[in-house]
Amino acid sequence: MENIIKSNPYSNALISTAENPQVAQSGALAGIALAVKDNICTNEMHTTCASGILETFTSPFDATVVDLLKQEGVSIVGKANLDEFGMGSDNANSWFGPVFNPLYPDEPHTPGGSSGGSAAAVAADMCHFALGTDTGGSVRYPAAQCSVIGLKPSYGLISRHGVIAYAQSLDTVGILTKDIDLLEKVFNILNKYDPLDPTSLTPHKRAKLKPPKPHRKLTFGLVKEYNIKGISENVKMAWSQIMDELIKMGHEVVTCSIPAIKNALPAYYAIAPAEASSNFARFDGIRYGSRAPEDRGEHGTLYAPTRQEYFGNEVKRRMWLGTWNLSTDAFNHDYIRSQKIRRILQEDFDEVFNRPNVLSGNEGQKANDEPGVDFIIAPTSNCAPYPLSKLNDSAPVDTYLNDVLTVPASLTGIPSLNIPWKTKQGNVGMQIMGQYGDDLGVMKVGRLLLDKCKELHQD
């Protein structure tokens, strides 16, 4: 709590804090402090989604992930700030004000988003780990910007029950921490089938997931399409250094191509807002949440004034975009076409990986004889955190490009782990991606690289 009192007034990482967090005497997580992203339901604190429309909303139940962690003795210290409803990548779109990156105390810098509060809370040692949600990069990108570890698990492994949906075919609950061992422990607690979540991977499918093989020579993919224009020299240097170190350790690095990556970002921004526009129909101020007094006016308006007053500009922008994508004029050209691109992207990734995809009808059999890879390593962000003042000089949609490196793993549902890689110019976020269900393998590689980075910088 001392670190919260010290750091939260500047960073604004936590929207609400527990007055007297309970400390359990037993359980795998006894004595461990947790911050929960404020779009994950808790029955003892408000769940606001950083939106005015839910400013006073308290859920009658805990999300499944919260319940599982409570059973293991975790202490919840607060609810973490975010971009409203998870829409954004700078954590500047919050009803409760922006989050400032605690690594830059002299000038407000972005912590990344949308789980910026979760990442900032971990970076400032307000908690041992935090829960976030990752729809298109919202755990990995802020983890990269705040120099912490962030996991987006395989879609369906961790329950979404009690997570207020943004885009249900993409939303995943992720974990942020500084400790790779704690990350694996929390993942194993949460990696359970949940009958309350219709998208939870069934026990039958889970039984097909193979554990990572014992230590052996691995093959890492260097995907050409991730080498996009605009990547800073420092990020390129970190990427190259990691690949060199893997070769020195006896592993193999091969160059490969996933052509559909170039279409991933526009496909994401057709699919995600379309799902959001449908999900957000429930926010009308009638059944729960804030309601504008004009809603009962003489003109008979029911909920338009409430949404106008309590939704932020970015939420309204994406709802308009999503509604358009589902309209008669755009449905076939934009939405259906984007779903086809998503399928092609999944097939392209399956062609690259050695392991089969248990979700594919052919069990992931490769259509060609080219050697596959075990893991893909690429940058999480193309540059270091920038001052929040920069947002004043850019168009709102310019920040959509922040997702360009993280969206492919979201569209395909594969696990992706951000780790901080130290360079002379500061830490760089690098992501490790594996085949669907190989989350433990991804964490194993993450531990390998974190140990190597520590070894290189012992002095």
Curated annotation (Swiss-Prot):
One of its GO terms (biological process) is glutaminyl-tRNAGln biosynthesis via transamidation. The keyword Phosphoprotein does not apply. One of its GO terms (cellular component) is mitochondrion. Keywords: ATP-binding, Ligase, Mitochondrion, Nucleotide-binding, Protein biosynthesis. Its EC number is 6.3.5.7. Disulfide bonds: none annotated. GO terms for molecular function: ATP binding; glutaminyl-tRNA synthase (glutamine-hydrolyzing) activity. The active site is at residues 37, 114, 138. It is found in: Mitochondrion. Its main location: mitochondrion. It catalyses: L-glutamyl-tRNA(Gln) + L-glutamine + ATP + H2O = L-glutaminyl-tRNA(Gln) + L-glutamate + ADP + phosphate + H(+). Belongs to the amidase family. GatA subfamily. Allows the formation of correctly charged Gln-tRNA(Gln) through the transamidation of misacylated Glu-tRNA(Gln) in the mitochondria. The reaction takes place in the presence of glutamine and ATP through an activated gamma-phospho-Glu-tRNA(Gln). Subunit of the heterotrimeric GatFAB amidotransferase (AdT) complex, composed of A, B and F subunits. This is Glutamyl-tRNA(Gln) amidotransferase subunit A, mitochondrial. It comes from Yarrowia lipolytica (strain CLIB 122 / E 150) (Yeast). The gene is HER2.
